[in-house]
Amino acid sequence: MIGRTPKLSELVLGETAEALSLHCDEALENLSDDDEEDHQDRQVFIERPYAVSVPCKRCRQTISFVCVCAPEAIRTLNRLLSASLSLVCPECCN
């Protein structure tokens, strides 16, 4: 950082985000019949990492990030990015 006040351009890191596997390979064991029925009754949302790349609204440079969410949430994000939501890269924020 140069000077007394930080600037966004000085805070941008040059490293790129990498998708990591967050899946757990453990299995549930020794469930009683009641536990199995209760588990089946509940709707289970599995959150997974999704790599997202979109163009900057101003300069069209690719903005990439990874988010962890349920499949329905990533579909909602896709609809928003396809319709009314736009992102701006750090360089264009100034």
From Swiss-Prot:
It comes from the Viruses. Highly phosphorylated. GO terms for cellular component: host cell cytoplasm; host cell nucleus. Its main location: host cell. A motif (Nuclear export signal) lies at residues 74-82. Keywords: Activator, DNA-binding, Early protein, G1/S host cell cycle checkpoint dysregulation by virus, Host cytoplasm, Host nucleus, Host-virus interaction, Inhibition of host innate immune response by virus, Inhibition of host interferon signaling pathway by virus, Interferon antiviral system evasion, Metal-binding, Modulation of host cell cycle by virus, Oncogene, Transcription, Transcription regulation, Viral immunoevasion, Zinc, Zinc-finger. The E7 terminal domain is an intrinsically disordered domain, whose flexibility and conformational transitions confer target adaptability to the oncoprotein. It allows adaptation to a variety of protein targets and exposes the PEST degradation sequence that regulates its turnover in the cell. Belongs to the papillomaviridae E7 protein family. This is Protein E7. It comes from Cottontail rabbit papillomavirus (strain Kansas). The lineage of its organism: Viruses, Monodnaviria, Shotokuvirae, Cossaviricota, Papovaviricetes.
